[in-house]
Amino acid sequence: MLPIILSAGPVTLYTYGFLLAVGVFLESFIIWRRLRDLGLKEEKVIDFILLGLLLGLFFSRLIFIVQNFSYFGWHPLNWLLFVHYPGLASLGWWLGIFVSLWRFVKVEKWDFWRTADEITFGLFPFLILLQLGSFLDGSGFGRSTNMFWGIYFPGILLKRHPLSLLSASSLFVIWFFLIKIERHWRVWEWYKSKESGFIALTALGLIFLINIPLAFIREAKVYLYLAQIALNFIAFIFILILFYLRSGRSLKKGYEKQKDSKTS
């Protein structure tokens, strides 16, 4: 583990805080550049980014506290001390960004799905660095394990699943996959509508899917981790349904086409 990058006299540079700052910068820059290229007003883009960061910080911290309530307890001061009690939930950050986006869609008449696709590419560098920071500072561990990938974390006697490292690796694979398909998905025949939203829905669907097995190794009380599994599964199914509805395909048309081929 590497909780501290640099310590010189009264100055201490924490790994988690440093990677968090780098992630915020990369996210803001990528989103700003992509939305500017869409032709959106630059001052409105900056307002959107600032609101998204504030809401993302709030929701991600809130969800992380709920997920790890046995660690935080009823101590509001611990909830606010990011350095001594670090941790943010990736899905909370997504929620904050998309609440901000919804506000600008209503007020500024932005195209929701087209903007969401562009924003998605900016979120992943932040989320990856966030999970990597949790791993390096020793807070991103899961349940105890005897498997070969188990790691000893500071202050813990038993090997634990490197939960944050697994999350960071999964997010990197998803991000790489989205970059590879960005210029190709519109020519895929099975996605008939060619409508925007493909990238954002793919990202969310894969994240919910990966969160299901990760929930099994998360350190939480039984009712909490069962709730996480159920909620992620429901969210994944919802994304699949939404994906299908936006794809331009129809079960009714497919059935009629199959029926006509049999009668001819």
Which positions does each model-derived feature cover?
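Hydrophobic, membrane-interfacing alpha helices
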Residues: 1-264
